Amino acid sequence: MNKRAKSKNREPLRKSPVKRGDEVVVITGSERGKRGKVLKVLRNTHKVIVEGIKMVKKAVRPSQDNPKGGIVEKEATIAISNVMLASKWEKRQEKKKVAVEKKEQG
């Protein structure tokens, strides 16, 4: 079974931990640690589009809006499980700092 068929069998998200406009941090992958604002939540595919993260180059055909066409850079989707709310991320980092300080003292 290929990846596309697998993702289509999932049920759409009923409740999402992140909403459009939220500040999120990427927690895994090549963009790990980067922050951005959620532009769109794709509930059916369990993915999000985050501003300035995972930029890809896309060939665009000439149209009335863009008579020249060419190559455009835009955001690609990221699995919703690979992002975390920035506020939650900061709390987690604070806990780690406290644990390290206690370990160094004792």
From Swiss-Prot:
Classification via Pfam families: KOW, ribosomal_L24
GO cellular component terms attached to this protein's record: ribonucleoprotein complex; ribosome
Keywords assigned by UniProt, alphabetized: Ribonucleoprotein, Ribosomal protein, RNA-binding, rRNA-binding
Key word Cell wall biogenesis/degradation present: no
InterPro entries reported for this sequence: KOW, Rib_uL2_dom2, Ribosomal_uL24, Ribosomal_uL24_CS, Ribosomal_uL24_KOW, Translation_prot_SH3-like_sf
Record-linked CDD domains: KOW_RPL26
GO MF annotation, one: rRNA binding
Keyword rRNA-binding: yes
Biased composition (Basic and acidic residues): 8-20
An annotated GO BP: translation
Known function: One of two assembly initiator proteins, it binds directly to the 5'-end of the 23S rRNA, where it nucleates assembly of the 50S subunit. One of the proteins that surrounds the polypeptide exit tunnel on the outside of the subunit.
PANTHER family: MITOCHONDRIAL RIBOSOMAL PROTEIN L24 (PTHR12903)
HAMAP family, A to Z: Ribosomal_uL24_B (MF_01326_B)
Cited NCBIfam families: rplX_bact (TIGR01079)
Similarity annotation: Belongs to the universal ribosomal protein uL24 family.
Protein name: Large ribosomal subunit protein uL24
Source species: Methylacidiphilum infernorum (isolate V4)
